[in-house]
Amino acid sequence: MKQNETFDQEREDLYHTFDEEDEESQTESSVPSTPLSRNRSEDVPVPWPRSYRQSMDLLTGVTPPTSTSFVSSFRQRRQSSVFGSFTSSPSKQQLLIDKDEIQSSVVSSIKSFLASHLQLSVPGDLLTPQENRSCTFSQSVLNGINVLCGVALLTMPYAVKEGGWLGLFILFSFGIITFYTGILLKRCLENSPGIHTYPDIGQAAFGTTGRILVSILLYVELYASCVEYIIMMSDNLSRMFPNTSLYINGFSLDSTQVFAITTTLIVLPTVWLKDLSLLSYLSAGGVISSILLALCLFWAGSVDGVGFHISGQALDITNIPVAIGIYGFGFGSHSVFPNIYSSMKEPSKFPTVLLISFAFCTLFYIAVAVCGFTMFGDAIQSQFTLNMPPHFTSSKIAVWTAVVTPMTKYALTITPVMLSLEELIPSSSRKMRSKGVSMLFRTILVLSTLVVALTVPFFATVAALIGSFIAMLIALIFPCLCYISIMKGRLTNFQIGICILIVIIGIVSGCCGTYSAIARLIGEMT
């Protein structure tokens, strides 16, 4: 009973810290306001989602938590921001407020009081709220590569089969375009000290509606990624143990279904954990996993004797939209770039971080795509690990790497979704906010990803759908639209023209890819 009360108190602190900050910010009314601050709405509720930045920090590994509890860490971070933060600014105008004047005035008042009444001299840096900028340049590069080079690597050779060799130029072009849109997000972040995350950018550009729309898309992408993890783990395990089956009360389950259920039961306890720091550190090793997978593929082709053979079409017009979706899936990590930027000790080096990360991942994708397709040709499957001969040691290492890696990432990926949904529970309902209800809610959410994975167990097609619909919006369309809106009146015609061109490319690619992916999905299910 005491444990539940403690849990309830932590959750109340987690979701009400923002309300306390709102009250504190209202006490600063004596400070002269800027033109934008005069438009502030005092009665607008705190915008959803409030837990985005902290939960995404865990996912990216940019600032692995050192406290014993994620909730405690989150609460401490929020309470340190006594001058207000982005989450207490629900409207577009509030996010664009220049808080330097307010902060400077309040700090000066505190210093004056301490000096005149208590004869104390306080260093300025102790009174100024500090952002958690702890990542070095090299750590930021690793974080960038880690979030970019994910499970999409496995399906790059399959994309060559679908789109042909010339489709690699599309992959390269997406690398350049998404690098540029990442720079646009950085410029949006620099526009105001109150902007820290992608939802903040959406809010600054289009108000609360923009924040909610961007957040929903980001959470749908995370949820879909968890579905892909289950499909990926079950496919690779069924490749290793193809004769596995299960019969229960007349129901027959093949190896893929058995392992989908098994892996879900394995990852389920990890979503109940309050301390995800260990998983965060393990997930940060995703770069090593990706390199290991590529080395195993090359080893199987060059040393184990699979060989390399040039084949395939130059361009497959019919299936190129599916390839476009897969390529887009490989570059849809813009949701976490603002977190990486906000965590850097030297934010001015963020463009270089993006350049190195995108250059490495683009060339890495191309190398794996060429290597995998020349090894297996038109027989290539949705994941190249499924084509590797199971009796080779390199194949076993690759398969187990493809199984273990998503196990470490599942809880970190689904946690932002769970926290955002738990925010919607009324604060007055203590029963709904109990530990038992929270565990039940999380269990249902995890089981729902299993149901989706069993319904559409097609890794490449689901990847193409995510890349075409969500990644095009997040990585191409929204960065340009938000940039134009936030920087209104300060852009040249050339800059606006480039943004409009990218938006058109994103819309055309997204529509064609989404239609083709849905059509193929229907065909595979029937």
From Swiss-Prot:
Q: Which GO terms describe its cellular component?
A: organelle membrane
User: Is Transmembrane helix tagged as a keyword?
Assistant: yes
Q: Which superkingdom heads the taxonomic lineage of this protein's source?
A: Eukaryota
Keyword annotations for this protein, in alphabetical order, are: Amino-acid transport, Membrane, Transmembrane, Transmembrane helix, Transport
Q: What's one Pfam family the UniProt record gives for this protein?
A: Aa_trans
Q: Where is the protein localized? A: Membrane
Q: Where is the composition biased (Basic and acidic residues)?
A: 8-18
Sorted alphabetically, the Gene Ontology BP terms of this entry are:
amino acid transport
Q: Annotated region Disordered: where?
A: 1-49
Chief localization? membrane
What InterPro entries does the annotation carry? AA_transpt_TM
Q: How does it sit in the membrane?
A: Multi-pass membrane protein
N-terminal signal peptide: none
Transmembrane region(s):
140-160, 165-185, 212-232, 253-273, 278-298, 320-340, 353-373, 397-417, 436-456, 458-478, 494-514
| Family that this chain belongs to | Belongs to the amino acid/polyamine transporter 2 family. Amino acid/auxin permease (AAAP) (TC 2.A.18.5) subfamily.
This protein's name: Amino acid transporter AVT1E
Q: Which organism is it from?
A: Arabidopsis thaliana (Mouse-ear cress)
